[in-house]
Structures are given as C-alpha cells and as structure tokens.
Regions:
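Phosphate/NTP-binding elements of NTP-utilizing enzymes
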Residues: 1-232
Length: 232
C-alpha cells in the first residue's frame, strides 16, 4: 500500500517536546509536504523535492518517516540521510530507530544488523544508513533509492558539491525513487540557494516547497484584548 498518511499515524511513533511517545499525526506543515510528495509521485512516478523551511516544523520527522516507511515495507530499497553535523546525524538516526522499535510487529521487518548508523533488513534486502557531510566518499559506489539531504545550506562548503554529486548520482532516475532536500535559509549563495532558485525557475526537475513559519500553531500566541499595534 502507498498511504503514508494512514501508515504514519498507525505505525510510527515520535517523541514529543513534552517527552511523550505519540503517533505521528501530520501537522499543517507536514501535510503541505505530504501533498507535494503525492502530487509529484502521481505525475512523475518519483520524488525530487526541495524544501525551504522554518525550524521545528516537523519536516525532517516527516521525511524520516517516509524513508522508513519505504525501506521497511518494500524489497531492495536503500535510504541514506546526510546532515550537516554529527549531532544532527545522530538525532535523525535515533528518530528512525524509534520508528523501528515502536513499529507494530505485523509491520516490523526482520533486522539482520543494527548499529549507530545503519539498519539492515535481510529478508527485504533493504537498509537505512546515515552519514555526516564533509567526507569525500558519501554515496560513492552505492545504489540508493531514497535520499534525505538535511540542512544542505549548512554543509561544509569545501566538500558540499562533491558530497551532493556523489549522493545524487547514486540514485537512478527510476519510478519509486525519492530525493528530499531541506534546509533553513543561509544567505544568497551556495548549493542550496542554487538548487532552490533552479527549482523555482523550473530548470532542474525539483519541486520547490516553501513552508512559512506562521503555519505552525506553536509559533502563534493569542493577542491580548488591550493590544495596540504600533506603526512598526
């Protein structure tokens, strides 16, 4: 089946800011991304999406869930997540490990190997691996089906392009594959800026998804009754 929205709230668990373990029910920002994924998959058979976002909107959570959904329910899939910092790499892998540990037994694939950076499902011949940008061989020699480039605007500038090329060249242009790029803004130059501009101009095959900060209810406060706006 392909209904990620149903799967996410039925099979995926997240840790909330209050420290509770709860089902992943898509929030407004996540639903915008979900709809963009569904639309591109329906029209092109694959996903190539770049996301310009605010912080704490749950978009890495959504992408991580989507990648786990695919590699844990399909044969011969390999997902790779690359972040800008080792702490972020560890956090995203821990999130995916939580998805796996809390997945209903009926849907949980048999695990052959699990480390601090990789989950391998031997019966499916699928796997999930994480890496930190800055190395020289990310994606080299791999065949990947799903990629998540996290905070691309903050990747180490000296190796960002090499890492990006190695990673994306490992993903064949075939139905069912997916490349997600997401980042907060970081100036008007660099690989993320160029990719975003190309997506907006319609020249590179990526769909631009801009999600404003005010869509998230947690960024809002109730206006006091005696509030008087100033000219500023």
């Amino acid at each position: 089946y392909d209904d990620f929205s149903f799967y996410s709230q039925s099979a995926l668990k997240i840790r909330t800011k209050d420290g509770d373990i709860q089902p992943l029910k898509l929030k407004p920002a996540q639903r915008i991304l979900h709809e963009a994924v569904e639309k591109q998959m329906a029209s092109e058979g694959k996903v190539r999406i770049i996301i310009l976002k605010a912080r704490q909107q749950g978009l890495s959570t959504h992408v991580g869930g989507y990648l786990y959904f695919n590699v844990s329910q399909r044969k011969a899939c390999k997902a790779m997540v690359i972040t800008h910092h080792s702490d972020s790499t560890r956090a995203l892998f821990d999130m995916t490990k939580r998805y796996h540990d809390n997945c209903p037994e009926l849907l949980k694939p048999h695990t052959k190997y699990s480390s601090r950076r990789e989950l391998t499902f031997d019966v499916l011949d699928s796997s999930f691996v994480v890496a930190t940008a800055g190395g020289e061989s990310i994606g080299r020699g791999e065949t990947l089906t799903h990629v998540h480039a996290s905070e691309l605007a903050f990747w180490q500038k000296s190796t960002a392009l090499e890492n990006w090329n190695g990673m994306t060249q490992a993903v064949p242009s075939k139905p069912g594959t997916a490349i997600f790029v997401e980042s907060t803004a970081n100036g008007v130059s660099g690989i993320f800026y160029d990719l975003w501009k190309g997506a907006v101009d319609g020249t590179n095959g990526y769909v631009p998804v801009f999600i404003p900060w005010f869509l998230d209810p947690e960024y809002r406060e109730t206006v006091p009754e005696n509030f008087e706006p100033t000219p500023e």
